[in-house]
């Protein structure tokens, strides 16, 4: 199956180009909130749909199986975005959805992290905290355990992402040296300074947080906590960018990866400056993962083109004029 068409003329005249959009927190294994084993064919279709929407890089943050890792091998690179992926997520007993992910026994985090790093495609994912009935989100791992996981991942050149919605866990994870904070509702100024100093990532997934608030109800204890967290996110966005953090757009399960532009637009609506929004949905993801960016001779022939300057109007991100992958136009 050939998904490409050769350009008959120069389509770039009068258009604005980015190297591609980035989804920094995706779950391609399933197309929604159904917590089931992954669907390889469905994941391939979602990846193709994302490419058609201008997505050039996906950081998949894990599932209950290795569907997305297998996808990377199954689908030729020219027919999908670049993909890095965690494999099976790591948690503890009662620390995530029942039966989802691998439970880490006390004292075994280093071994489990090493296994996860070997199975994944560049990442491991830890569920840093999870709500317990009547208590709210509780830390699943001690800070020393997080440090062990980071050390084990480093030995295999893998990065570590940590899910966190609790108050204390973002600071623990940052001090432990993790590479990416997922959600991170309660990051502090000290956290973003430390994270930025090492070029770490933060993927706030605002649309997912707002969807969860709606599901829980704004007056519930969980809803109130997340509302407070989203307000903290708004207050930290500019500080994080200034500190050098790679703030990235991420869809999670709220929307599809092909809709990642909606997350960028939401960040803009929440007060993030337009240039920073464009960085978050494009350039920063490539830089954070060590990929070349730019359009100099010899650079990768990948681009998403827009009829308006996205810095002047971020809403145009949702309506690309053309997408180029490896020198060919996506049809």
Question: How should each PLM-predicted stretch be described?
Answer:
Residues 1-19:
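Histidine-rich, glycine-flanked metal-binding segment
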Residues 15-77, 94-99:
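Metal-associated gating/positioning segment near the N- to mid-region
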Residues 28-40, 93-104, 133-139, 214, ...:
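Acidic/histidine-rich helix-loop elements
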Residues 39-49, 101-117, 165-169:
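Short, acidic/polar
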Residues 43-69, 80-91, 119-134, 159, ...:
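Divalent metal-dependent hydrolysis catalytic cores, especially in the metallo-beta-lactamase
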Residues 94-147:
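Active-site gating/metal-coordination segments in enzymes
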Residues 133-234, 242-248, 253-255:
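Active-site core of metal-dependent hydrolases
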Residues 155, 230-309:
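His/Asp/Glu-enriched, well-ordered alpha-helical/loop segment
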């Amino acid at each position: 199956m050939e998904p490409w068409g050769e350009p008959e003329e120069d389509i770039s005249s009068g258009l604005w180009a980015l190297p591609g959009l980035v989804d920094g927190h995706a779950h391609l294994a399933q197309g929604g909130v159904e917590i089931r084993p992954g669907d390889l064919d469905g994941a391939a279709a979602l990846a193709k749909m994302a490419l058609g929407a201008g997505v050039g890089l996906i950081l998949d943050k894990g599932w209950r199986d290795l569907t997305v890792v297998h996808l990377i091998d199954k689908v030729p690179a020219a027919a999908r975005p670049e993909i890095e992926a965690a494999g099976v997520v790591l948690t503890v007993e009662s620390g995530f959805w029942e039966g989802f992910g691998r439970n880490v026994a006390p004292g075994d985090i280093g071994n489990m992290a090493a296994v996860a790093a070997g199975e994944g495609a560049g990442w491991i994912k830890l569920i840093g905290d999870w709500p317990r009935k009547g208590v709210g989100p509780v830390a699943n791992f001690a800070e020393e355990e997080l440090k062990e996981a980071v050390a084990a991942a480093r030995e295999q050149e893998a990065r570590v992402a940590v899910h966190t919605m609790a108050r204390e866990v973002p600071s623990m994870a940052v001090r432990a040296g993790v590479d990416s904070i997922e959600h991170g509702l309660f990051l502090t100024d000290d956290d973003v300074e430390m994270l930025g100093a090492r070029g770490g990532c933060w993927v706030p997934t605002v649309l997912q947080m707002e969807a969860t608030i709606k599901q829980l109800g704004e007056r519930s204890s969980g809803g109130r906590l997340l509302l407070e967290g989203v307000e903290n996110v708004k207050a930290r966005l500019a500080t994080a960018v200034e500190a050098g953090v790679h703030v990235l757009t991420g869809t999670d399960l709220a929307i599809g990866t092909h809709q990642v532009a909606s997350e960028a637009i939401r960040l803009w609506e929440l007060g993030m400056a337009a240039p920073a929004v464009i960085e978050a949905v494009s350039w920063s993801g490539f830089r954070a993962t060590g990929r070349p960016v730019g359009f100099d001779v010899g650079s990768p022939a990948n681009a998403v083109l827009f009829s308006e300057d996205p810095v002047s109007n971020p809403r145009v991100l949702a309506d690309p004029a053309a997408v180029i992958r490896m020198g060919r136009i996506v049809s």
